[in-house]
Amino acid sequence: TCTVLGADSAAPEFLSLKEDIGVVLDEAYFPESLNALQVGGVMAKTYRRWDGKQYQNYLTRFGLPEKKPFKDFSRGMKMKLAIAVALSHSPKLLVLDEATSGLDPIVRDEVLEIFNEFTREEDHSILISSHIVSDLEKLCDTIAFLHKGRLLLCEEKDALREEYALWHG
């Protein structure tokens, strides 16, 4: 088992944690026929703390069309919609799985800035899986290396930089 936000994954209360977790995968999965406004409507029924105004602010900030079907979104637009959804229910933890892979550099920088804004709140954290070292450098305080499901190393980013000279900041 594991512990997430203080709850054991085997405990019954673990299921209630969905309210505190936002997830962005390497692909955005929404029904293709829905538009951004309809996705927001579905999420409002899914999350008790859904903030429609915040969601609308993200749609505007990202320049996402409200009535265009999801199937017609570009990859960058799909990722931005997934991020808007993940952030619009006041999560404490963001789980990001290759959330910036395949994005053009301008969109990636914009997305990373939003994730940085999220972590400025004291009770907010990000768990990120990425092969893009520059993204890890921009977002992470602590880095863990996994290989075949085993934890090989877990240290603060600055200590890794000093001890192993893995990258230069």
Over which residues does each language-model region extend?
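ABC ATPase NBD Q-loop/coupling interface
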Residues: T1-S16
